Structure formats: C-alpha cells, structure tokens
From Swiss-Prot:
Belongs to the DEAD box helicase family. DDX46/PRP5 subfamily. This is Pre-mRNA-processing ATP-dependent RNA helicase PRP5. Residues 38-54 have a biased composition (Polar residues). InterPro entries: DEAD/DEAH_box_helicase_dom, Helicase_ATP-bd, Helicase_C-like, P-loop_NTPase, PRP5/DDX46/KHDC4_KH, RNA-helicase_DEAD-box_CS, RNA_helicase_DEAD_Q_motif. It comes from Saccharomyces cerevisiae (strain YJM789). SMART domains: DEXDc, HELICc. Residues 89-102 have a biased composition (Basic residues). The Q motif is unique to and characteristic of the DEAD box family of RNA helicases and controls ATP binding and hydrolysis.
Length: 849
C-alpha cells in the first residue's frame, strides 16, 4: 500500500510540475503578446498625434496670416479716416481682464503650448477631431461664456455706454482670440485712437436742405420806443449807466417789461411772483437785441440781471419751434457755465419759468453729479440743457456720439464767458460749436472782455452787437470798498477776527432794537464771505477760526462734491452765516443776503477783484468789500488804488491812504523798469519788459518817454478796461507780427483754404519755437489743419534772385474751413510770443556779469 501511495504522489507532483511549466510558458507568451500590442498602439497614437498636430499647426498658421492681413487693412483705414472715435478707459480694463481669464484656461501640454487654443470660435472647436462621443466640458463652458458675453454686451449697448474702440479692433480675426502679437497690435491701435480722439466730438457739416428753418426775430418795437429820436436814445443810454454799443442795427433800449411783448403768464411771473421792478441797464438793451435774433456780447458787472436777459428770448424761441418728436432727444437751447454752482443756479432760474409749462423740459449736466440720471433725462427728450463744457463733451462722446444730437440746437449761451476761458475751456467750447448748426443764435455774457475772448467772438459770432454797461467803473457802485494794511500774517488774522466780532456786535445791537420795537420785524440776515487764495490756506484759516470760536462753512475744490453742496446749502439756510472759500465761488454765486466780503489774500488781477467784490451788493442791495493787505503785496495795492473811488480814499485813515499810495507808486515804478508786471487774468503777456529792453539797447532817451506813455495807458486801462479795445492791443507792438496771405481754392467742386505764414525774418529762437515739431503737432491736433515747412532760409539782406529760386522760408497751412486757418495762425502767434520771451531771457542772461 505504501508503494502504491508513493507512486501516486510522484505522478501527482510530476503532473503539477508539468502544469506549472505550461502555465509559465503561457504567461510568457501572454506578456510578449501584450507588449507587442502596446507598442503597436503607441506607434499608432504617435502617428495620429503627429498628423493632428501638423494639421492644427497648418490651420493656426493660415488663420494667423488671415488675421494679420485684416489687421493691416484696418490700420490703413484707420490712418486714412479722420473721424474721431470715443474711447472709454473702463472698457479697456474689462477687456484685458477677460483676456486674462481666457488665457488661464489654456492647455498646458508641451506639444500645444506654442499654438494656444481659441475658446470663442465655434468654427475652430468643431474642426478639432473628436475621439469619443462624449461632449467636451471645456466646449460647454466656453459656449456658455460666449453667450453670457453677448448678452452682457447687448445690455451695455442698451444702456447707452460708449462703444469701445478695442471691441471693434479685436473683431478683425472673426471671433477667435488673437495671439500675443495680435493683442499688442490692437492695443497700439487703441492707444493711437485714444491720443487722437479721446473726448473729441465729431465735426458735423450741415447742408441747407437738412436744416429745419426756425424763427429768430420775435421783437416788435412798441410805439413809445419807436417814436424816440436818436438824441433821446442817446440820453436814455447815458442815464442807464452809460451804455456803449458796438455794431450796426442795434434796437433801441426799453424801459418797461410791457414793451417786450411778453405773454401774460410770463408778465405775471415776473411782476407778481418774482417781484422784478424796473429793468436793469443790461436787460433794457440786451433783451430787445437778443429778441431781434442778433448775436449779442453783453458786458456788465456781476449781479446785474444777465440771466434773465438771455433766458426770456431763449424760452420764446423754444416755444415757437416744432416740438421734439418721439425719436428726438433735443436740445433746442444750450447754456454753458464755467462752474457747477453757476450751472445749478441757472437751472433753478429756468425751472421757475418752466414749472408751469410742461412743454419745456430742462436738464442740468455738471461734473460731480450722477451721469446715469442725466443720461436718462436726456433720452426722454429735453428742450434746454444747462451744462459745464467738460460734462457736455462727455455726453456728446457717449455711444459714439449717438446719445445726444445737436441738430436741433438753435440758441447757444455762454455765461461768464471770460471765466470759461480763464479756466481753459476754449478747446471744449470750440469743439462744441463745430457740432452746432452754423445759423444758430449765439449769446455771450461776461463781466470783462479780454483780447482772447474777443478773438473767439470774432470767429464764432455773426455780426454781433456788443453792449457794455458802466464801462468807466466796473466795480458795483453799491459796494463800499475798504482795506487794511498789515505787517505780518498774525496781524492779518487778528484783523480778520476783529472784523467778524465787530460784525456780530453790530447785528446783536440791531436785533435788540428790533426786539424792543415789534415782533413783526424780520430778523437781520447779513451773510459774509471770506476769500482765500488756496485750499491749504482755506483749511488752515477754518481751523484757526474754529479755535477762536467762529464757525464757518468751508468750500474749495479739494472737498467732495456732496460736502461742498451741503456746506453751501447750510450757508444759504442759516442767518448771518460765514462762508470761507477759494476762487471757485468768486463768480456766479448768487446769495442776495451777502453784505460783507473779506478778501484775505490780495487779488492778483483786476478782473478777479471785480468778480470777488461782486459777491455782495447783489441787485439793488448795498454791501462792503474789505481787503486785508500785507505790506509787500504791491500788486494788490496798485489794483485797489485804481479801483477805489476818490470819495472812498478820502474817507480812509490818512496814514493808511498814504501807505497805500506809496505801495502803488512802488509797483508802478517797478513796472516801468520791468521788475513787476500786472497779470491780466488770462495768462498775462508780461511783454512790456521785453519791449523796454529792446528799445533800451536802441535808444535810451526814447525809452523814458515810452515808459511814461505805457504807464498812462496802463492807468487808463485799469480805470476803463474796455476802452482800450477800440485801439490796437498793446502787446501787438511788442511782438513780431506774423505776415501771412490767405487764399481760397476750388478744385473738383471742393473748396480748400490755405495760408502762407512768412517766418524767414523772425529772430532765430522765435523761428525755432514756431517751427519745431511739438508746435506743429499741437496746432494740427487743435485745428485739424495741415502745416508744412516751405522755402528756404535767407539771411538778412539776401533775397531770392529770380523766380526759379526757392522763396523765403514760410509755413503753408491748409484746411477746409477759413476759421480753422485763422485759429491756426492765432495759436502760431502764441508760440511766437513764447519764442520772444525765451529770446529776451537769453539776452538778459548773456548781459549778466
């Protein structure tokens, strides 16, 4: 039995061993088969991937070439196009952020990293071969992203946002994302567009056929006025603060509201609700002139009723026109103001006349206010817009200029025009005027009329009538002028505190007397305004006064708009309140209760003094203006000595009056020697010194006589700022005049204007200043004219020998509008003045030991 069992075990073990060997052989063959299969699969994958990569690369290269070709075409079109494009910086930021998000989802495979993946193009996604039937989650994500983007862009367009230049430029290659090179090219184009067209409105050329006719002349002279003789008219104008008229065809002045032919509702509002009595001098002459449809320049002191002078004719012209249709936004009348405070004040006056008439709507558009509400009101349609130039430019450039149409504007008003130009709004106003129909009626009101403003009026207004009121004394006769001379800042601040305490004690006495008389007597409300020269001084004085127990309402441009508005409302609401502010409110603020103005920092210009003192004595009220002078503020003393009336100087302390005259004489003597100069408020030329240096080198004896003459002329100009406009400006004799010829040429039915400005004989530095690239680029940017250097330079005493020789050096200015040519020449003359200043400074430096 044991032998049999052992044999069975041996057979079993041999069988197991044989099976193990077979299993091992099978596993080996299986492993070899799997290895061969895996190698074959990998080789097939490599071949497939290489083919797919090659196809993708070829497709990408082909698309890239197509995009670049389109980009080059668009660049060429962009260079040829003269139409400016509005650009909104916030859109560019959002565009960049979107591009960054898309790049973050790119594949990181090494084989495809150089190619990149386009996520916005369905066409490109569909061309990628699919290896299975499952839907790619990346495709789903990008499809939803694209739909979301389209809905967002549509929503933004509906809200009237600006169409971004980059949105148009990035569409050159279909809807695919561009690579880094394409994005760089597009960003460069966007930058060029920004530099060329940021906040620049498109000039509109109107043909007579597309302009809707409108009526300008509504004035019918009453029998009483028409029966007046020329002698009676002259006597009436003399009695009305010596009205001076320039221009032809000016209507006769009126003396009663009933002579203007106003409607019954307007007459009731003026006489019974607003309690307007007789007409002011500017209203007597300006209202008939504007109602006759003439362009008017009104020059009158502040607080003389200029707003009503243009508001009544504007409302009458708007009512006579066809109402706005459903698809028209308007406006028909445009009023431009230098500050938001003045714009809000004008808007309030408009509201008084239109609140009972639903057919006339008014919108106030100023910076610092919410633009969304302004846009909503404009979309509903408005007949009158009161705006600051900067905000109106913003609105005109919204939605590529499609938000607001200027086609219906027939009446344009520039209130406080000298301040508009003093704040540097001339380029914006020029752009706005190019969008308005040429047969508009334009009215310009100002307290002063400098040469720069005169030049603008000549270009824009058509045969205007100039009305000047009280030209021999621009300071309101109801303002009592005083001053105090201090020898330190501490002494000046002590004088300020003393003036405020004296004012408070006076009001307490008056109030106690009123309390003892009757309960029906109104409480005295006499407000005060303190003007300082800077924001830092305003904050510093406010804190010092608060420490002294004096509460003020401080306002300056550095404070938030809401805080400024709140302080201004508090000043108007509280009785006997004190306003501390900078020059931001030196014009246009109308608070009739102001009885005292304190000029803490001496003014630098005569125009500034006129407007600062004009904050008191509004209408027929009286007021006091006190200037605190330091002993070294000579220019302020000179302005005061020329502005104050003789009876006011006689009423002063003799010692103070003597010191004022000494300071004024010292400044006047310094002007003769070129040591001092009086700023004109519009940048000041300061060229008297240049002339004196030039003539001193030529003839010292003649220089003394001409200095005396210049001093007399300057004194005359201070006493009578507008009388000097009849003669040639003083500065014109001090600067080399630009000789030029203006030509008009018609070719192929188009009219081209060009001018030749001869610069060969100008001094070298002046010639360089006028012909350098920055000057020419600046003029091209401002006017759109083409400027080219022509001819060659000939030294002094040499001329071209014959017609074949090149002419003397000159600048060729070409443009489509004669006014643009004139503006280019004026800008060139300003650069010539800068060159004269440089030449004079170099000459003075070369003579120093």
């Amino acid at each position: 039995m044991e032998t049999i069992d052992s044999k069975q075990n041996i057979n079993r073990e041999s069988l197991l061993e044989e099976r193990r060997k077979k299993l091992a052989k099978w596993k080996q063959k299986k492993a070899q088969f799997d290895a061969q299969k895996e190698n074959q699969t990998s080789r097939n994958d490599i071949v497939t991937n290489s083919l797919e990569g090659k196809q993708t690369t070829e497709k990408f290269t082909e698309r890239q070439e197509r995009v670049k070709e389109e980009l080059r075409k668009r660049k060429n079109e962009f260079r040829k196009s003269d139409e400016p494009v509005s650009v909104k910086p916030s859109k560019k930021k959002s565009k960049r952020s979107k591009v960054k998000k898309k790049i973050s989802f790119d594949f990181s495979d090494d084989d495809d990293s150089e190619i990149g993946v386009s996520f916005r193009s369905k066409e490109h996604i569909q061309k990628v071969p699919e290896h299975d039937n499952e839907k790619d989650p990346l495709d789903e994500f990008m499809t939803s992203l694209k739909e979301e983007k389209m809905s967002n862009s549509k929503g933004m367009y509906d809200r009237g946002d600006i169409l971004d230049v980059e949105d148009q430029l990035f569409e050159l290659g279909g809807t695919d994302d561009e690579d880094v090179e394409d994005n760089t090219d597009n960003s460069n184009i966007a930058k060029i567009a920004k530099l060329k067209a940021k906040k620049r409105v498109k000039q509109i050329y109107y043909s007579p056929e597309e302009l809707e006719p409108f009526q300008k002349n509504f004035y019918i002279e009453s029998e009483t006025v028409s029966s007046m003789s020329e002698m009676e008219v002259e006597e009436l104008r003399l009695s009305l603060d010596n009205i001076k008229i320039k221009g032809t065809g000016c209507p006769k002045p009126v003396t009663k509201w009933s002579q203007l032919g106003l409607s019954t509702d307007t007459m009731v509002l003026i006489t019974e609700k607003l309690h307007f009595g007789s007409l002011t001098p500017i209203q007597s002459q300006a209202l008939p002139a504007i109602m006759s449809g003439r362009d008017v320049i009104g020059i009158s002191k502040t607080g003389s009723g200029k707003t009503i002078s243009y508001l009544l004719p504007l409302l009458r012209q708007v009512k006579a026109q066809r109402p706005l249709s459903k698809h028209e936004t308007g406006p028909m009348g445009l009023i431009l103001a230098p500050t938001r405070e003045l714009a809000l004040q004008i808007h309030e006056e408009v509201t008084k006349f239109t609140e009972a008439d639903t057919s006339i709507r008014s919108v106030c558009c100023t910076g610092g206010s919410e633009m969304k509400k302004q846009i909503t009101d404009l979309k509903r349609g408005t007949e009158i817009v009161v705006a600051t130039p900067g905000r109106f430019i913003d609105i005109l450039t919204l939605n590529d200029g499609k938000l607001l149409s200027t086609k219906r504007i027939t009446f344009v008003v520039m209130d406080e025009a000298d301040r508009l130009f003093d704040l540097g709004f001339e380029p914006q106003i020029t752009q706005i005027m190019k969008t308005v129909r040429p047969d508009k009626q334009c009215v310009l009101f100002s307290a002063t009329f400098p040469n720069k403003l005169r030049s603008f009026a000549v270009r824009v207004l058509h045969s205007p009538i100039s009305i000047t009121i009280n030209s021999k004394g621009m300071v309101n006769e109801n303002v009592k002028q005083k001053f105090r001379i201090c020898h330190s800042e501490d002494e000046k601040f002590d004088n300020l505190v003393q003036l405020i305490h004296e004012r408070s004690e006076f009001f307490d006495e008056v109030q106690s007397e009123n309390d003892g008389q009757s309960s029906d007597v109104e409480e005295v409300d006499a407000k005060a305004i303190i003007f300082v020269s800077s924001q830092n001084i305003c904050d510093f004085i406010s804190k010092k006064l608060l420490n002294a127990g004096i509460v003020t309402c401080a306002i300056h441009a550095g404070k938030p708009y809401q805080e400024r508005l709140m302080n201004l409302e508090k000043f108007k609401r509280e009785k006997n309140s004190i306003l501390l502010c900078t020059e931001v409110l030196s014009r246009g603020l109308n608070v009739p209760e102001v009885s005292l103005v304190i000029i803490y920092n001496a003014v630098k210009t005569f125009a500034q003094y006129v407007h600062t003192t004009g904050r008191t004595a509004r209408g027929s009220r009286s007021g006091t203006a006190i200037t605190l002078l330091l002993h070294d503020e000579l220019s302020g003393a000179y302005i005061l000595s020329k502005a104050m009336r003789d009876e006011e100087i006689k009423a002063l302390d003799p010692l103070q009056a003597k010191e004022l005259q000494e300071m004024s004489a010292k400044f006047e003597s310094g002007m003769k020697k070129g040591k001092f100069r009086l700023s004109k408020g519009f940048g000041g030329k300061g060229l008297e010194n240049i002339k004196s240096k030039r003539e001193e080198a030529q003839n010292k004896d003649l220089e003394l006589k001409k200095n005396d003459k210049r001093s007399d002329d300057l004194e005359k100009k201070i006493n009578n700022p507008h009388e000097g406009h009849d003669s040639e400006p003083e500065s014109s004799a001090l600067i080399p005049r630009l000789n030029y010829e203006l030509f008009k040429e018609s070719t192929d039915g188009s009219i081209i204007f060009y001018a030749k400005v001869y610069i060969n004989d100008l001094p070298q530095i002046v010639r360089w200043e006028a012909t350098k690239n920055t000057t020419l680029l600046f003029i091209k940017h401002e006017t759109g004219c083409s400027i080219t250097n022509k001819g060659k330079f000939y030294p002094e005493g040499k001329e071209p020998k014959n017609e074949n020789d090149e002419p003397k050096l000159y600048l060729l200015i070409e443009g489509q509008d004669e006014k643009d040519i004139q503006l280019s020449i004026e800008l060139l003359e300003q650069k010539v003045k800068e060159g004269v200043v440089k030449a004079a400074s170099l000459s003075l430096k070369s003579t120093k030991y």
